[in-house]
């Protein structure tokens, strides 16, 4: 678009002789059950969830609610709706990822949310949800990401195979100007920023992860990842680990400090799309839409992956986020609900 096996501990000396750690499948065990189901208004016939996320500055979970046209903010502690903001006109048809709003990001007092109806990005005042500006896009949006260090908004547009980058001049009404367009032949899919290295990472649709310089907006590297279909990305910048979700049912760990070297892979449920990681607990959350499950992995200091638990989710449940405090949220598009899981 943002997710079984077991490993024993590996010493540093042993690692020196290994190019790649591959986890073995874990023996079948009963799937664990989510602790709560959160219903989203208008979701009785399903919601085309996609890029759900967490806004640390607001302390809320971001739920762009697809064809309802609403951005829903959840209080992760209570599981209750903290705010609902209208982004675009509700769609009449059944749920789909490219209807209404499907991605949102926070930055510098603003919320930016995708609008598939225009297509464009709607800019809200984060204090009250008031619409401040609308930005027209060249093509339909996928990911909407704010790069705070440069006050830029990056919008991926897979159909046009490009990323549009906008400069944001803050004020009562922000001034938004197109900075550049980055061509991405064969992509882009997913997007994460590495501010330590002034990089952005995105995937191509087949076996490649692309490195972009966030200062020049130029691609500076192309890494071979072990995925037939690379999808979601997550980054632990402090350790230099880039996690890549493979739609065929695998997750990989790349070393961003050594040319994208593959450190480890592990099998997981098929249909992987969006993934999420918690650097504090060193846990990686990997849902599979086809397997209707989510695996929680422990990430070792070497990058090896150890499966801690597998939860039952739902068919089509492809997106996940967490609040960094052990609360994990998985979308259930068919039911129009959010599944809450307590990290073990």
Residues of each region from the PLM?
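Predominantly soluble domains enriched in secretory-pathway, periplasmic, or organellar proteins
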Residues: 20-344
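Bacterial N-terminal signal peptides
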Residues: 9-22
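Short amphipathic alpha-helical "recognition" segments used for binding
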Residues: 7-10, 161
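N-terminal secretory signal peptides that target proteins for export/translocation
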Residues: 1-5
């Amino acid at each position: 678009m943002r997710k079984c096996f077991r490993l024993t501990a590996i010493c540093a000396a042993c690692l020196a002789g290994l190019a790649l750690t591959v986890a073995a499948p874990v023996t079948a065990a009963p799937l664990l059950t989510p602790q709560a189901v959160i219903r989203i208004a208008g979701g009785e016939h399903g919601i085309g969830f996609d890029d759900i996320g967490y806004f640390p500055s607001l302390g809320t979970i971001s739920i762009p609610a697809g064809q309802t046209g609403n951005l829903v903010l959840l209080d992760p502690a209570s599981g209750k709706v903290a705010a609902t903001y209208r982004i675009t006109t509700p769609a009449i048809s059944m749920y789909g990822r490219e209807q209404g709003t499907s991605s949102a990001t926070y930055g510098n007092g603003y919320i930016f949310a995708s609008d598939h109806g225009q297509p464009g990005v709607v800019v809200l005042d984060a204090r009250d949800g008031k619409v401040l500006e609308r930005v027209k896009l060249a093509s339909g949006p996928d990911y909407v990401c704010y790069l705070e260090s440069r006050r830029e908004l990056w919008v991926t547009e897979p159909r046009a195979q490009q990323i549009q980058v906008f400069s944001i001049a803050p004020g009562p009404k922000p001034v938004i100007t197109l900075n550049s367009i980055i061509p991405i032949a064969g992509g882009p899919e997913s997007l994460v920023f590495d501010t330590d290295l002034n990089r952005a990472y995105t995937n191509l649709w087949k076996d490649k992860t692309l490195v972009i310089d966030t200062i020049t907006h130029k691609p500076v590297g192309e890494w071979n990842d072990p995925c037939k279909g690379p999808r979601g990305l997550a980054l632990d910048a402090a350790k230099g680990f880039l996690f890549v979700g493979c739609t065929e049912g695998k997750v990989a760990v790349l070393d961003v400090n050594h040319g994208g070297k593959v450190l480890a892979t592990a099998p997981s449920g098929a249909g992987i799309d969006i993934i999420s990681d918690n650097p504090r607990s060193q846990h990686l959350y990997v849902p599979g839409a086809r397997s209707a499950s989510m695996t929680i992995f422990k990430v070792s200091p070497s990058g090896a992956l150890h499966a801690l638990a597998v939860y039952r989710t739902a068919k089509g449940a492809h997106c996940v986020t967490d609040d960094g405090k052990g609360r994990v949220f998985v979308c259930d598009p068919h039911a129009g609900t959010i599944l809450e899981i307590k990290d073990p």
